[in-house]
Amino acid sequence: MSTPIALVESLDQEGRGVAHVEGKTIFIDGALPGEQVTYKVRRRKERYEVADVLDVLQASHLRTQPGCEHFGVCGGCAIQHLEFSGQVAAKQRMLESNLWHIGKTRSERMLPPIYGPAWGYRHKARLRVRHVAKKGGVLVGFNEKSSSFVADMDSCRVLPPHVSNLIVPMKELVGQLSIRDRLPQIEVAVGELATVLVLRILEPLQPQDAAPIKAFADRYGVEVWTQSKGPDTVQPFYPLQGPGLSYSLPEFNLTYPFKPTEFTQVNPYINRVMLRRAMQLLQPQPGERIADFFCGLGNFTLPIARSGASVFGMEGSAALVARANESAALNSLAGQVEFQEADLFKMTPALLQSLGRFDKWLIDPPRDGAIELVKALPDIEDADADTSHVPQRIVYVSCNPATLARDAGILVHTKGYRLLASGVINMFPHTSHVESIALFEKASP
């Protein structure tokens, strides 16, 4: 039986090449658009197959040598073999394709893509840990590609260099602990004044574990925390009084303290540029009342408030609402912002109307999108609907182009908005993750 050959047409949202052979869709790991490849099928379904590339018979001009020796085994990155500008262009095409095929809409203009450093950008990560005696001890890293096994790695180029350099010492540290078999994860969080490692422990540390942990923290200048159960069990182990984590937005004269397990943007360089773009699109003005839905710890809320607008933030996490209030007070903005805990996936038209009138919205939902929120807006076909609370402008920041496209379709086709602009934000270089931003404006009657 001859080895099958395919001509790759596009990339899917997992960074795999997409081809069609004899009426069947083939998803090929390691293949790029425009390439002719041979492949080996590893999973067969009735309508599609998943395969690995064997040989590249005709290579794309955008194919490049991966920058990390672990690429192809480690599952942390999916498209290091695609030249950096090609990654951004592929993500732009994914966004446009989703908007059209899912939302049945197109953006009136495409925004220039936002991108920054290709390496060392990832300031938060969850590293898997496994004690495997036959592999020489402890593994610390991301999962292997398409596997639940931990990749055997000694560095990671998307992590900041000082964190990458800790991978081998972390292996050695875990190997010295009494609970090396009961420590499945180390969560890394990098702030401007500190780096924190959170040890996820399934059993309590023993007294003899303190000495190696303290020696490690002192030698490498990090804080070591522990987490025994849920997020509320996260606490410092050593030192007990460190400088703590924070990030700043100098353009807006803002500083945000945060806990290592609280949600913050993984890429602080792109976060600053993304905020500038969001403010340019939102155009907040003094005296306006603006809603920030899924506001988290106030990453967008406080820059909006700096403009002189009054901002109302809603967030599902009580801990993040508390953190947002703390940051507002720290930055002398408590008088301009109000935060409320609410499950935005249970939004209703009545609840939305009860919040009062907003001139503008900013939405930054998780991967599930904001469907209940946008559905709560009055339909254009409902002539009797009260539209006094409807925002004239919506800026939507998305981490999933499929749910953005779905929500965009609702806003455009049933809620009376125009999709004025959209563009990609390369928050996660070398991965297939697509972050994007879109601007909607209420259409004239």
Swiss-Prot record:
Keywords: 4Fe-4S, Iron, Iron-sulfur, Metal-binding, Methyltransferase, rRNA processing, S-adenosyl-L-methionine, Transferase. CDD domains: AdoMet_MTases. Residues 1-55 form the TRAM domain. S-adenosyl-L-methionine binds at residues 265, 294, 299, 315, 343, 364. The lineage of its organism: Bacteria, Pseudomonadati, Pseudomonadota, Betaproteobacteria, Nitrosomonadales. It is an enzyme of class 2 (transferase). PROSITE patterns: SAM_MT_RNA_M5U, TRAM, TRMA_2. The keyword Iron-sulfur applies. Catalyzes the formation of 5-methyl-uridine at position 1939 (m5U1939) in 23S rRNA. It comes from Methylobacillus flagellatus (strain ATCC 51484 / DSM 6875 / VKM B-1610 / KT). InterPro entries: 23S_rRNA_MeTrfase_RlmD, MeTrfase_TrmA_CS, NA-bd_OB-fold, SAM-dependent_MTases_sf, TRAM_dom, U5_MeTrfase_fam. Belongs to the class I-like SAM-binding methyltransferase superfamily. RNA M5U methyltransferase family. RlmD subfamily. GO terms for biological process: rRNA base methylation. It catalyses: uridine(1939) in 23S rRNA + S-adenosyl-L-methionine = 5-methyluridine(1939) in 23S rRNA + S-adenosyl-L-homocysteine + H(+). Its EC number is 2.1.1.190. One of its GO terms (molecular function) is iron ion binding. [4Fe-4S] cluster binds at residues 68, 74, 77, 156. NCBIfam families: PRK13168.1, rumA. HAMAP family: 23SrRNA_methyltr_RlmD. The keyword DNA damage does not apply. This is 23S rRNA (uracil(1939)-C(5))-methyltransferase RlmD. The active site is at residue 399.
